[in-house]
């Protein structure tokens, strides 16, 4: 995908997407060969991860894939024959960047120390996991993630009177199968500042419900969710600028301009088809009348915007487009009704976020 094409897509994303652009661009397929990433990770893992009794897909107790479980890659050394040795700095410590990976009962997350938000959070839902009711939101509380070095943590006080919800990336309603799973969704490393009315408590919540309803058709649905910080063209000078608020005192947590979800709906067969849907929404009020298809984007556009590749090992012949396989449409539910159905408990300093 060219930079010109990417800028055009980013412009569409900044404006809230568009069905015509989506239809035009979705047929694009990148021919670029994947390259092996070089990252530094810090890993937090749950000691025991129960599996819903009728779950037959991926066992969360299985070892993490090598890409997640491997230690830091070998540090670069000096070039033979060079009169200088920049690698000598690493004797004092390697600067990173570091992605704090957490493997918990309900999710796996990668945390961005610079923005104090996750890069991405992955979840897996099935008809069996959603049918169980072992967890209740009223027994959960928002908590700071102490597995992250203190100076890089998002803090509860950062959100206090900020005007933003503590927006779940993996929603609590997806993790009712145990209280521990429910509790795992309340770490601040699973949160981003989200606009409440019109977004987190409305359109975004309807979108999360759409993801859950996919399990009526697909036996296994995997979802990766995360924030974006997209540039916007200045109408005066025509240049692109990335601008976002930072909440907290002192400023600590970045407020994303947009959020993405990439959905992998599996047919349940070994080597079977996977219906992929990639969506980007602005962190702003969205009318409930807005078609969900307006926010569908090519996977490659989301990857370029996020700096992340989601499906390098998924063969093209196994990929299907989610919104041609099933109807991509939200069902509007009032916020008060969702509170009752989700089992939400007492109030805090602000309305709890979905």
Please place each PLM-identified region on the residue numbering:
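Domain-level detector for secreted/extracellular nuclease and nuclease-toxin modules, and
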Residues: 2-354
């Amino acid at each position: 995908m060219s930079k010109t094409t990417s800028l055009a897509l980013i412009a569409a994303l900044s404006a809230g997407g568009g069905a015509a652009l989506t239809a035009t661009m979705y047929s694009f397929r990148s021919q670029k060969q994947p390259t092996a990433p070089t990252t530094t990770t810090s890993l937090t893992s749950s000691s025991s991860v129960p599996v819903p009794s009728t779950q037959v897909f991926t066992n969360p107790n299985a070892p993490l894939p090598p890409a997640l479980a491997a230690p830091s890659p070998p540090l670069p050394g000096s070039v033979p024959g060079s009169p200088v040795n920049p690698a000598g700095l690493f004797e004092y410590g390697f600067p990173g960047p570091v992605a704090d990976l957490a493997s918990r009962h309900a999710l796996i997350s990668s945390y961005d120390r610079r923005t104090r938000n996750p890069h991405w959070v992955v979840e897996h839902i099935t008809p069996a996991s959603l049918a169980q009711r072992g967890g209740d939101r009223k027994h959960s509380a928002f908590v700071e993630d102490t597995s992250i070095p203190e100076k890089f943590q998002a803090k509860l006080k950062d959100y206090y009177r900020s005007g933003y919800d503590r927006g779940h990336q993996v929603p609590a309603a997806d993790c009712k199968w145990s209280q521990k799973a429910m509790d795992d969704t309340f770490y601040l490393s699973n949160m981003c500042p989200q606009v409440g009315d019109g977004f987190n408590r409305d359109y975004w919540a309807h979108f999360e419900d759409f993801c859950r309803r996919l399990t009526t058709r697909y036996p296994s649905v995997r979802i990766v969710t995360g924030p974006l910080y997209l540039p916007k063209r200045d109408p005066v000078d025509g240049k692109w600028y990335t601008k976002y608020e930072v909440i907290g005192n002192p400023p600590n947590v970045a407020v994303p301009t947009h959020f993405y979800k990439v959905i992998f709906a599996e047919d349940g067969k070994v080597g079977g088809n996977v219906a992929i849907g990639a969506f980007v929404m602005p962190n702003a009020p969205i009318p409930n009348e807005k078609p969900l298809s307006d926010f569908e984007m090519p996977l490659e556009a989301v990857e370029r915007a996020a700096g992340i590749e989601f499906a390098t090992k998924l063969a093209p012949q196994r990929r299907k487009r989610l919104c041609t396989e099933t109807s991509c449409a939200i069902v509007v539910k009032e916020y008060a009704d969702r509170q009752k159905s989700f089992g939400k408990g007492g109030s805090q300093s602000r309305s709890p976020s979905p």
